[in-house]
């Protein structure tokens, strides 16, 4: 906008908002500055708005900052409004800036667009804005006058100085002139104000003028209440009031419409009040009591008094004149009774005839109907003073009806403090006279006294009222004729009773009153008989009880209506007493206990007394605030409330079986009559009972009541008939208040019953029935309708009235909907409520748009805040686009949101809620957040896109909020700062790259963002603002996300400097200390802090910060070992402090969080941490503390502590004696395992379906990970406990400690039982693997192995292990998955379980030998098919899994081969099959090692690569498509796979050959006499190298080929370091060392030679072999071995390593190192052996 920058003056509405405390300006100094700056405007009042002038027109036209179109529109507006041209332009600018409903971009075009310009005036939007500005200005003055003397108001001192200034500068004179001007102003016409001034506009102008007149008079009245008025001022006012007829003879009265009557009446009322207040009656009464009337101002103003007489003498034809005439007449009489003229006497009599007390009652009722504020209280005080003056100076009989006086007093005493003022006065003066009068007529006239006392009850006077009525000293009754049992005085002025009299004709035993014999009574005769006042003392409360009893007696007679009229004031009084002072409730029990019977009986009469019943229900509602349970129980027996005929079901869909009770019949009558007093009382009662937090059983009884409200009232109340204005709004408010109270009940404990509680009933009904639509309709009223109602309400304060009631109802609807969405159970189906909330309407007519437009509401900031809160909730949970719902209004609404966010006086809570809404929108509303981000895109020369912030981008505001140097930043408002940082965190968390890129480039962004991290935080207390902790937490998370997203080299220099500064200024240490202190505070308070949310946020962020720092130590400069030790020490100490606190879920949760980061630090910083002994000691204490808690709550925590212990044990190898409290730690771990394993087994048995067995698959070719059950997790307690037990077991080298534990606890039987169950049903994979790892470690010691064997390990696993690998029922097996895609070989799998079991058998056999031989043979016998299948599968499935199983299997067979005789005895056929399969296995391994191309072929097939169907030449590769061209990464992966497979084949080959040695004769024995039958011929007599794909019997050629392969590999490793195998095996990162590989190759070679020689000698000594074959064997073998010997000699001459098994060879050992150096090949035992054999063969 062109001149937006010129706006510097605050609008009157803004000023009013500031004074109300609804802005961000809360400090008294700020309020004082505003009042100083705009005090002159307040003093001028409406005169601030000047009329048009020629000079002003010239200034506007000369202003170069204004566009011509804006000047023109401003001048037209000036003529239309009759306002100064400059002010008109300024008004137009502020309207376009604050209230225009379009985008700020479109504002520029409004003045140029004729259609839009006309719309501003024709649609009255500009007019409304101007009128509101005028009213707001007067409201500011009113507000200041109301509260400048109120010490409780926070700005009373500032207001007082402002009032002092205005009083000095003659506020009254200025405002009186304004009032005169308004009274005499001519109505505008189209000639004077332009063509836009239509009749409707004139009518609106007149309404505005009436409202302004009323407010000016109200200001003058309040001014006179504080400052004395001079007689001349009163005279001038009186003349003016007479001129305009106290509002009845207005200048433009032809414009008055019926709707304006309340304003006209209000003008008259304030005119009268000003007159009464200006008379200063209180001073007059004080002067009269002291006989110093000459001190009154009017006593010396005789001329003014005469003029006043002449002015007032003509009055008397209107009700407004009554109080004026009477007050003036009494003043004249009090000042000088002797000089009272007949004119004055005539005024008095005229006033009495005008029914002044009825008028005063109507006046106070009218003032209080719209609002109940300071003005009303001041008016009541003024009338109270007037009544006191009248009653003091006039006889009561002169004042006509006593009832009118009582009615007026009832209204007067409704003001606070006036009842106390009355009780502190003399009882014989003023209204005390009235009290004495009504007491004299009690109980003949029952109502006046009760009504008066009902008004006199206050918090401080309730007990006085009770005591007064409890000690009544007279009883007045009426007699038509003189009774026969009376003795009378001669003049019949005194009577005396000769007999006692029972006052109430009640039954025997009932409460009653009895006038005793001899009682004296004063007689007052009247035209209807005798009125006798007996001198009889009694309690009125007893009398009231008798009256209620009498009503119960006459319920079914014609007297019931009359008796109800007598009893209703009693009930009203009791209600007021109980609601004011609950401590008196017990004393009133005889009365309140009878109300239930009244309800029960009167509900069923023909024409129930509705008002009376309403009072009864109200009384019970007041009583329920103190004793809700008792009221509910007693009320339930009456049948008044709705009830369920049948027990309440779990899901209430309809009201079937519900009875509306007595209230239901009354409800029908009320609907037909259009009056709803009982319904309102019913709602108040039920709300009170709900808030009373009844027990669950009693709350169930309220379900029918709530259901009645939800099904019958809420959906239909807006369609009912109403006789009175405003009742519908009250009903809606009460219904929603009840629902709101239910939804805000504290959650009850879970119960086993299926009956619904009140909350679930409300949630179900609102989400699935018409009740929810009714709430939506209330929210859908819209901001325009609400603003219109606010503008038309008659009250002057703007804070009370009909508009306020509607606003509160809408706010309740917002809160209810928000709570329903928050509390409703999760469901995949969309409920009708959610559908209605999110459905798209035509032309933007949908609820989302309506909610968003509440941002335009300016009166109460809590309304738009609640609307935005609901929008936020919907954006979180509803599957819809808010942006789409807003339609074409989206940009305008965005600008409105950002305008309020930018406004420096805007309420802080709205700003916070807007930011929270945007924070949610980042994740859930992509379209909307892009609209708010408003990023502008530019294409750079490089072809990339460059982003910048648009003018209306929310990031502009956020950057300003976090800028510590900006005076308007949020640094003074911690909650707002936190919300801004939270929004930025959402951008990083959702990875909004464009926004992040723009923010990174902003200067000082990282400095401003991270500033809080470098400050010094005060230690938090209960009263401190803790949002700074959340702010710091979000900042830490943003830094973590930035480091995580960005490549190290791409971090901005600014952030790098910040991180370096963070390290250099020792902020790691500072924050570690701070977080540690918070943790210790929580631990000391046992989790009872009020700030746990903030603490948890900071702790979570610090945890993330440390995790990122451990992985990016160089980036975050966390490399100092001392700092690392300090951080870990604090984390460990905090964890220990929290987890040692008993019975605190909070401490447990926080401790578990810290435990996670402790595990990471342990693993990442092993080398920097202190001795593990101290860490283990603390962890042991933590574990003991955790084990003392409820085990169902600490499962995850136990797992984390176990993981920490495992990591601590891995810091360095330790012996059991070095581990602190080792025995106790082992015992704790085993006891925990015992409990957890039992639970796991029970859980497994319950959860496993019956058909699990049919789903098992063959695991030979698959890595079946199984289905991980909920309790069988990799990081579960059982699994980690077993791994910890394994680590502890490794530390106990001797096994003594574990032996003791195994004797003390049944650990092994329990583990074996769990393992057996898990294996049988093939569940708990991780658990099974962990057990086997633990058992494998335990079996290293002889004691552990013996214990396992004794506990029956073989019986446990032998048969159940079959289910791990058996085929499914269809017998099919699945293909091996791609090697590069499947998990690591170490990942948990069922084949892995089988492999571990085989290894365990091997370890046990190795440790126990003959003691375990029988079990080992049993195991082999059971699994022989699997063993043989595994040995043969290497040829067809050369995958790592298959090779690994073959490796374990051959290893086990190697150990078992030490017992060949026993094996042959028990399993003769199996041993033969094993021998054959081992030979074939040897041949398969040799072939695969020999043909690397074939091995790669297999690997490529496993990886899914396409191969040619025909065999390709050895030197060629199959052409690949361009998409499959090999890359460096794929080649490296292929080499690693090749290395792994070759290494596995070599290990298998070595173990296979070593095992076969047990089945061939020993070289030392074979030359001696030997039984050859016990050794089978293993290899065929053939020397041909076998082909891989041919099923050829293993032969000598196989062994020779093996030697050739090993020799070739050794040569390649030495010659070609760049050979693929050499490269792979020689990598520094490889797990296989080059030296070990060479040793393994030599070991294979030795065993080949050994087998070759042994089998050759076996052939030579076998008589069954033909001599010709023996000779051929000698020749072939001699030739082959000679060739191999020469190759071996060359290898050893090059420096090859000696045989690893040289000591086992029969050839002599080398004698010294020097000999070996001279002729190394001659000294090699292997060569010597082969040479000896060659010589033997050649002989």
Curated annotation (Swiss-Prot):
Disordered: region residues: 1249-1269, 1506-1530, 1696-1717
Pfam families: Nup188_N, Nup188_N-subdom_III, Nup188_SH3-like
Domain of life (superkingdom): Eukaryota
Compartment(s) where it occurs, according to its Swiss-Prot or TrEMBL record: Nucleus, Nuclear pore complex
Biased composition (Basic and acidic residues): 1254-1269
Main location: nucleus
One cellular component (GO) term of this entry: nuclear pore
Keyword Nucleus: yes
Polar residues: compositionally biased ranges: 1506-1528
GO terms classed as biological process: mRNA transport; protein transport
Disruption phenotype: Morpholino knockdown of the protein causes abnormal heart and gut looping.
Keyword line: mRNA transport, Nuclear pore complex, Nucleus, Protein transport, Translocation, Transport
Keyword DNA damage: no
GO molecular function ontology, one term from the record: structural constituent of nuclear pore
Similarity comment text for this entry: Belongs to the Nup188 family.
Entry function: Component of the nuclear pore complex (NPC), a complex required for the trafficking across the nuclear envelope. Required for proper protein transport into the nucleus.
Subunit annotation: Part of the nuclear pore complex (NPC).
Full protein name: Nucleoporin NUP188
Name of the coding gene: nup188
């Amino acid at each position: 906008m062109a001149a937006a920058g010129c706006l510097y003056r605050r609008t009157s509405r803004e000023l009013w908002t500031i004074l109300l405390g609804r802005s961000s300006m809360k400090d008294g100094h700020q309020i004082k500055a505003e009042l100083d700056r705009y005090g002159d405007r307040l003093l001028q009042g409406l005169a601030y708005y000047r009329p048009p002038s020629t000079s002003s027109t010239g200034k506007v036209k000369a202003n170069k900052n204004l566009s011509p179109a804006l000047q023109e529109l401003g001048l037209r507006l000036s003529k239309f409004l009759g306002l100064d041209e400059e002010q008109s332009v300024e008004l137009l600018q502020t309207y376009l800036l604050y209230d225009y409903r379009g985008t700020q971009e479109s504002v520029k075009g409004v003045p140029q667009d004729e259609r839009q310009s006309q719309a501003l005036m024709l649609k009255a939007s500009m007019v409304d804005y101007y009128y509101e500005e005028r009213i707001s200005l007067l409201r500011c003055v009113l507000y200041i006058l109301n509260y400048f003397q109120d010490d409780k108001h926070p700005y009373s001192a500032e207001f007082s100085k402002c009032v002092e200034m205005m009083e000095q500068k003659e506020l009254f004179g200025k405002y009186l002139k304004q009032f005169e001007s308004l009274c005499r102003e001519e109505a505008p016409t189209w000639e004077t104000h332009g063509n836009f001034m239509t009749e409707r506009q004139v009518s609106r102008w007149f309404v505005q003028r009436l409202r302004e007149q009323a407010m000016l008079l109200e200001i003058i009245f309040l001014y006179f209440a504080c400052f004395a008025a001079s007689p001349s001022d009163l005279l001038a006012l009186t003349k003016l009031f007479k001129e305009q007829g106290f509002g009845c003879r207005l200048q433009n009265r032809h414009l008055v419409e019926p709707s304006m009557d309340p304003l006209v009446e209000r003008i008259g009322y304030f005119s009268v009040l000003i007159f009464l207040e200006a008379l200063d009656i209180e001073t007059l009464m004080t002067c009269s009591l002291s006989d110093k009337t000459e001190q009154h101002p009017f006593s010396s103003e005789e001329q003014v008094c005469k003029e006043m007489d002449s002015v007032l003498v003509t009055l008397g034809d209107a009700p407004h004149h009554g109080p004026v005439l009477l007050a003036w007449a009494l003043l004249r009489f009090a000042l000088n009774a002797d000089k009272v003229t007949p004119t004055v006497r005539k005024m008095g009599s005229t006033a009495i005839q005008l029914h002044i007390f009825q008028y005063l009652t109507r006046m106070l009722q009218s003032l209080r109907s719209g609002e109940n504020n300071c003005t009303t209280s001041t008016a009541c005080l003024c009338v109270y003073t007037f009544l006191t003056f009248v009653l003091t100076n006039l006889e009561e009989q002169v004042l006509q009806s006593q009832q009118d006086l009582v009615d007026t007093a009832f209204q007067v005493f409704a003001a606070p403090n006036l009842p106390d003022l009355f009780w502190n006065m003399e009882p014989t003066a003023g209204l005390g006279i009235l009290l004495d009068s009504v007491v004299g007529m009690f109980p003949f006239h029952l109502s006046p006294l009760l009504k008066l006392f009902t008004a006199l009850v206050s918090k401080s006077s309730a007990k006085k009222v009770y005591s007064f009525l409890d000690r009544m000293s007279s009883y007045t009754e009426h007699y038509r004729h003189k009774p026969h049992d009376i003795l009378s005085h001669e003049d019949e002025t005194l009577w005396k009773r000769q007999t006692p009299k029972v006052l109430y004709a009640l039954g025997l035993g009932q409460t009653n009153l009895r006038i005793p014999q001899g009682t004296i009574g004063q007689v007052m005769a009247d035209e209807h008989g005798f009125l006798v006042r007996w001198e009889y003392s009694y309690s009125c409360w007893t009398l009231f009880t008798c009256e209620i009893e009498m009503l119960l007696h006459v319920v079914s007679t014609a007297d019931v209506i009359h008796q109800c009229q007598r009893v209703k004031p009693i009930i009203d009084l009791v209600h007021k007493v109980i609601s004011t002072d609950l401590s008196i409730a017990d004393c009133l029990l005889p009365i309140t206990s009878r109300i239930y019977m009244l309800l029960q009986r009167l509900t069923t009469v023909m024409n129930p007394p509705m008002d009376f019943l309403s009072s009864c229900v109200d009384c019970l509602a007041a009583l329920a605030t103190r004793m809700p349970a008792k009221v509910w129980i007693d009320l339930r027996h009456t049948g008044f409330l709705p009830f369920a005929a049948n027990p309440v079901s779990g899901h209430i869909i309809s009201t079937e079986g519900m009875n509306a009770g007595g209230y239901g019949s009354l409800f029908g009558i009320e609907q037909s009559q259009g009056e709803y007093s009982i319904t309102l009382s019913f709602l108040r009662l039920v709300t009170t009972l709900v808030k009373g937090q009844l027990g669950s059983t009693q709350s169930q009884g309220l379900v029918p009541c709530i259901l009645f409200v939800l099904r019958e009232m809420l959906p239909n109340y807006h369609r009912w008939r109403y006789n009175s204005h405003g009742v519908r709004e009250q009903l809606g408010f009460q219904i929603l208040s009840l629902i709101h109270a239910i939804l805000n009940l504290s959650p009850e404990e879970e119960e086993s019953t299926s009956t619904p509680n009140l909350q679930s009933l409300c949630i179900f009904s609102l989400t699935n029935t018409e009740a929810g639509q009714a709430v939506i309709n209330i929210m859908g009223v819209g901001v325009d309708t609400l603003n219109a109602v606010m503008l038309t309400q008659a009250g002057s304060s703007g804070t009370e009235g009909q508009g306020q009631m509607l606003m509160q109802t809408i706010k309740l609807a917002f809160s209810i909907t928000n709570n329903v969405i928050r509390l409703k159970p999760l469901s995949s189906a969309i409920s009708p409520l959610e559908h209605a909330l999110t459905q798209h309407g035509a032309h933007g007519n949908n609820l989302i748009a309506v909610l968003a437009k509440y941002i335009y509401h300016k009166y109460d900031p809590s309304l738009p805040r609640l609307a935005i809160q609901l929008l936020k909730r919907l954006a979180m949970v509803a599957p819809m686009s808010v942006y789409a719902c807003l339609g074409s209004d989206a940009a305008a609404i965005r600008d409105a949101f950002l305008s309020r966010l930018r406004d420096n006086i805007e309420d802080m809570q709205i700003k916070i809620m807007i930011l929270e809404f945007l924070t949610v929108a980042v994740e859930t509303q992509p379209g909307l957040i892009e609209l708010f981000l408003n990023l502008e895109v530019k294409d750079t020369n490089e072809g990339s896109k460059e982003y910048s912030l648009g003018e209306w981008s929310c990031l502009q505001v956020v950057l300003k909020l976090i800028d510590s140097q900006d005076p308007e930043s949020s640094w003074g408002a911690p909650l707002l700062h936190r919300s801004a940082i939270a929004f930025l965190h959402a951008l990083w968390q959702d990875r909004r790259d464009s926004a992040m890129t723009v923010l990174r480039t902003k200067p000082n962004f990282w400095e401003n963002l991270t500033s809080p991290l470098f400050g010094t935080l005060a230690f938090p207390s209960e009263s401190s603002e803790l949002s700074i902790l959340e702010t710091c937490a979000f900042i830490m998370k943003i830094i973590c996300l930035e480091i995580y997203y960005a490549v190290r080299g791409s971090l901005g220099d600014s952030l790098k400097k910040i991180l370096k500064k963070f390290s250099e200024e020792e902020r790691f240490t500072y924050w570690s200390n701070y977080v540690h202190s918070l943790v210790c505070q929580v631990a000391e308070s046992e989790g009872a802090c009020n700030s746990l949310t903030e603490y948890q946020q900071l702790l979570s962020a610090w945890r993330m910060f440390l995790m990122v720092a451990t992985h990016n130590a160089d980036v975050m400069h966390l490399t100092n070992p001392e700092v690392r030790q300090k951080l870990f020490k604090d984390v460990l100490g905090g964890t220990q402090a929290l987890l040692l606190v008993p019975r605190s879920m909070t401490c447990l949760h926080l401790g578990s969080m810290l435990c996670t980061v402790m595990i990471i630090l342990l693993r990442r910083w092993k080398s920097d941490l202190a001795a593990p002994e101290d860490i283990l000691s603390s962890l042991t204490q933590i574990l003991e503390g955790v084990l003392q808690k409820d085990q169902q709550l600490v499962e995850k925590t136990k797992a984390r502590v176990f993981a920490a212990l495992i990591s601590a044990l891995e810091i360095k190898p330790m012996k059991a004696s070095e581990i602190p409290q080792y025995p106790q730690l082992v015992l704790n771990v085993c006891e925990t395992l015992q409990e957890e394993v039992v639970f796991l087994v029970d859980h497994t048995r319950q959860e496993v379906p019956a058909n699990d067995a049919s789903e098992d698959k063959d695991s030979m070719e698959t890595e079946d990970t199984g289905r991980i059950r909920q309790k069988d997790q990799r990081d579960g307690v059982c699994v980690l406990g077993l791994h910890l037990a394994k680590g502890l077991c490794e530390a106990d080298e001797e096994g003594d400690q574990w032996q003791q534990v195994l004797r003390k606890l049944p650990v092994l039987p329990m583990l074996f039982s769990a393992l057996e169950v898990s294996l049988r049903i093939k569940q708990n994979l991780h658990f099974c693997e962990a057990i086997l790892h633990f058992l494998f470690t335990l079996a290293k010691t002889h004691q552990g192995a013996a214990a396992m064997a004794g506990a029956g390990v073989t019986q446990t696993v032998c048969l159940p292990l079959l289910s791990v690998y058996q085929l499914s029922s269809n017998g099919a097996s699945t293909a091996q998955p791609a090697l590069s895609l499947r998990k690591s070989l170490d990942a948990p799998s069922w084949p892995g379980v089988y492999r571990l079991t085989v290894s365990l058998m091997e370890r046990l056999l190795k440790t126990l030998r003959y003691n375990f031989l029988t079990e080992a043979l049993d195991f082999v016998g059971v699994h022989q098919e699997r063993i043989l299948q595994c040995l043969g599968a290497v040829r067809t499935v050369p995958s790592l899994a298959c090779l690994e199983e073959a490796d374990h299997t051959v290893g086990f067979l190697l150990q078992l081969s030490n017992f060949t005789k026993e094996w042959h005895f028990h399993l003769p056929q199996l041993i033969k099959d094993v021998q054959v399969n081992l030979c074939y296995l040897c041949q398969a391994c040799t072939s695969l090692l020999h043909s690397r191309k074939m091995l790669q072929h297999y690997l490529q097939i496993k990886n899914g690569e396409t191969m040619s169907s025909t065999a390709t030449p050895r030197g060629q590769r199959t052409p690949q498509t361009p998409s499959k061209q090999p890359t460096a990464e794929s080649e490296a992966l292929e080499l690693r796979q090749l290395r792994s497979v070759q290494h596995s084949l070599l290990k298998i080959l070595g173990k296979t050959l070593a095992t076969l040695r047990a089945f061939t004769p020993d070289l030392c024995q074979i030359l001696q006499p030997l039984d050859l039958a016990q050794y089978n011929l293993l290899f065929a007599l053939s020397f041909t190298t076998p082909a891989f794909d041919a099923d050829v019997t293993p032969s000598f050629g196989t062994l020779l080929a093996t030697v050739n392969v090993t020799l070739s590999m050794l040569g390649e490793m030495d010659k070609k370091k760049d050979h693929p195998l050499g490269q792979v095996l020689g990598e520094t990162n490889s797990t296989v060392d080059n030296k070990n590989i060479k040793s393994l190759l030599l070991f294979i070679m030795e065993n080949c030679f050994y087998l070759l020689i042994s089998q050759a000698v076996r052939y030579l000594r076998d008589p069954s072999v033909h001599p010709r074959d023996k000779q051929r064997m000698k020749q072939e073998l001699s030739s082959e071995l000679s060739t191999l010997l020469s190759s071996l000699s060359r290898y050893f001459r090059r420096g090859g390593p000696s045989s690893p098994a040289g000591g086992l060879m029969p050839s002599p050992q080398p004698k010294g190192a020097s000999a070996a150096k001279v002729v190394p090949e001659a000294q090699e035992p292997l060569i010597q052996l082969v040479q000896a054999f060659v010589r033997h063969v050649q002989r």
